[in-house]
Curated annotation (Swiss-Prot):
Catalytic activity, EC: 3.6.5.n1
Function description: Required for accurate and efficient protein synthesis under certain stress conditions. May act as a fidelity factor of the translation reaction, by catalyzing a one-codon backward translocation of tRNAs on improperly translocated ribosomes. Back-translocation proceeds from a post-translocation (POST) complex to a pre-translocation (PRE) complex, thus giving elongation factor G a second chance to translocate the tRNAs correctly. Binds to ribosomes in a GTP-dependent manner.
Residue ranges of domain tr-type G in the record: 11-193
Entry protein name: Elongation factor 4
Pfam families: EFG_C, EFG_III, GTP_EFTU, GTP_EFTU_D2, LepA_C
Organism (species): Macrococcus caseolyticus (strain JCSC5402) (Macrococcoides caseolyticum)
Compartment(s) where it occurs, according to its Swiss-Prot or TrEMBL record: Cell membrane
Major subcellular location class: membrane
Length: 607
């Protein structure tokens, strides 16, 4: 291709993504767009086509972003090249959204005609506005009996401030309004800016590992062109490689001669090491490099940490490999080795939130076949010591000696909860119970309220979302962002089994709730830990002080079964012997702890 052809082609490229709250019909709309642009043969079409992971299809959510190239012949007779970059909608995967938006010029904002704007929609809209994207509002599911498109149109204008008078009324399921959406993309989304003759600049927005071809990087070309045989250089690491193949996804990978400005495709360069192709890095030519890298992504810091251990201790190295491969295209995953007396060798892994944690654990069990035990998640606490130093604690068992701690700080989040006004009382009660501080309350219209609370992250992390959904019959939607640290009265609680501390069961709790929580946990463990041949005391302690205790009764073997009547001293001798045996067993016996026991520490509030 010469330069003139490249520039002409560039004018016909439209890069866009679809943003929406969970369940507002994003993946279905993506399916319809693929169908209407005839980019997928009818027989290959299946629901949620872009959600390639089994987990995504089962849970009906999008986890990873995906990019596809489509050709669309518009009403003006021109054929346009669309790049659709699919995004997840769940709060834990916000970083996936910010990654895909950085590769676009426009975004389709999908809002459910029955439910209206939800917390996640707003959060993603702000991300899109930060990236200066052109927003196209679409009101989806208008064929539902409960649909109120006019109310939602007004809501988009009032809450987001977008002109929604031309908003497309659509139903992705019934294939209504899809043509109008495609035409609006052509009209409203600007073509990519960039110079095909400038030095190459390409943003890596995703990467995956293939056993045969090495690392496959998904890239968006900002300036310049790249083709097979080029010598390229990663700007963050300075490593150089030779390009083996460039291509586009039509959802299948298809090699092409070159990728030029505005193209979204993939590149392989026999990169063997997972760490050499970092998401957010800039690729440039080794011989004629760009002067400065593109602005990457802001690093998402993990908020929740938990210990992950293989049940079969021989699989420790396999687990390390699994985590490295997942980290390749999940930049926010962090891990470091740790050991526990109760569980052996494993890793301390950092996640963005609970859903992220669940999904990663499930992916390790499925994709790599490693069975795991996970400890209770905890957040990062900061301790100001009496000698003026600061200690950061991400694992409750590493909490310093309470005598040496002056103050403890814990992370707080600003939680915005959108809810119908019938449930305001229930939401406020839940937030108070979770130690939240009320901030503001705005009425969006006559039925929906946006409530803002500051809540400790440790309270949000466990089961806040589940409780919020159940106390509002599923109507509330919820989004949170970290706002910083605040001082709290926190103590570390240890659980002792048979007089020994189990490090993996320790957790950090607010002093006012310590007694109740200790009591609940001890009772719960009593039912979960199998009975031994000797009596096992279960205790909850803060420092040296035991605050709750119960006993797991022993399984009694009837040693008198073979005595038929007869001499009392004979029976007494057998009972004494049994008692001595049990005492000895108790001093050396160890207690097996089932996986449920670790989870019991989390799910406290169900009582």
């Amino acid at each position: 291709m010469n330069n003139e052809q490249r520039l002409k082609r560039q004018e016909r490229i439209r890069n866009f993504s679809i943003i929406a709250h969970i369940d507002h019909g994003k993946s279905t709309l993506a399916d319809r767009i693929l169908e209407n642009t005839k980019s997928v043969a009818t027989r290959e079409m299946k629901a949620q086509l872009l959600d390639s992971m089994d987990l995504e299809r089962e849970r009906g959510i999008t986890i990873k972003l995906n990019a596809v190239q489509l050709n669309y012949t518009a009403k003006d007779g021109e054929t346009y090249i669309f790049h659709l970059i699919d995004t997840p909608g769940h709060v834990d995967f916000t970083y996936e959204v910010s990654r895909s938006l950085a590769a676009c010029e426009g975004a389709i904002l999908v809002v459910d005609a029955a439910q209206g704007i939800e917390a996640q929609t707003l959060a993603n809209v702000y991300l899109a506005l930060d990236n200066e994207l052109e927003l196209i509002p679409v009101i989806n599911k208008i064929d539902l009996p409960a649909a109120e498109p006019e109310r939602v149109r007004q809501e988009i204008e009032d809450v987001i401030g977008l002109d929604a008078s031309d908003a497309v009324l659509a139903s992705a399921k019934a294939n209504i309004g899809i043509e109008d959406i495609l035409e609006q993309i052509v009209e409203l989304v600007p073509p990519p800016m960039g110079d095909p003759e400038a030095p190459l600049k390409a943003l890596i927005f995703d990467s995956a590992f293939d056993a045969y071809r090495g690392v496959i990087s998904s890239i968006r070309i900002i300036d310049g062109t790249v083709k097979a045989g080029d010598k390229i250089k990663m700007m963050a690491t300075g490593k150089e490689f030779e390009v083996v193949e460039v291509g586009i996804n039509t959802p299948k990978q298809m090699p092409v001669a070159e990728l030029t400005v505005g193209d979204v495709g993939y590149l392989t360069a026999s990169i063997k090491n997972v760490g050499d192709s970092r998401v957010g890095d800039t690729i440039t030519h080794a011989s004629n490099p760009a002067s400065e890298p593109l602005q990457g992504y802001k690093k998402m810091n993990p908020m929740v940490f938990c210990g992950v251990y293989p049940i079969d201790t021989g699989k420790y190295n396999d687990l390390r490999e699994a985590l490295e491969k997942l980290q390749l295209n999940d930049a926010s995953l962090e891990f470091e080795p740790e050991t526990s007396q109760a569980l052996g060798f494993g890793f301390r892994v950092g996640f963005l939130g609970l859903l992220h944690m669940e999904i990663i654990q499930e992916r390790i069990e499925r994709e790599f076949g490693i069975e795991l035990i996970a400890t209770a998640p905890s957040v990062i606490y900061k301790c100001e010591m009496t000698d003026g130093s600061e200690v950061v604690v991400d694992n409750p068992s590493k909490m310093p000696d309470p005598q040496k701690i002056d103050k403890i700080y814990e992370p707080y989040v600003k939680a915005s909860i959108m809810v119908p006004n019938d449930y305001v009382g229930a939401v406020m009660e839940l937030c108070q119970k979770k130690r939240g501080n009320f901030q503001t309350m705005d009425y969006l219209d006559d039925i929906r309220v946006n409530i803002i609370y500051e809540v400790p992250l440790s309270e949000v992390v466990f089961d806040f979302f589940d409780q919020l959904k159940s106390s509002t019959k599923g109507y509330a939607s919820f989004d949170y962002e970290l706002i910083g640290y605040q001082e709290s009265k926190l103590v570390k609680m240890d659980i002792l089994l048979n007089g020994e501390t189990v490090d993996a069961l320790s957790f950090i709790v607010h002093r006012d709730f310590a007694y109740d929580r200790g009591k609940v946990i001890v009772e719960k463990l009593k039912t979960l830990i199998p009975r031994q041949q000797f009596e096992v005391p279960v205790q909850a302690a803060i420092g040296q002080k035991i605050i709750a205790r119960t006993n797991i009764k022993s399984i009694g073997k009837n040693v008198l079964a073979k005595c038929y009547g007869g001499d009392i001293s004979r029976k007494r001798k057998l009972l004494e012997k049994q008692k001595a045996g049990k005492a000895k067993m108790k001093s050396v016996g160890s207690v097996e702890i089932p996986q449920d026991a670790f989870l019991a520490v989390l799910k406290m509030d169900e009582e």
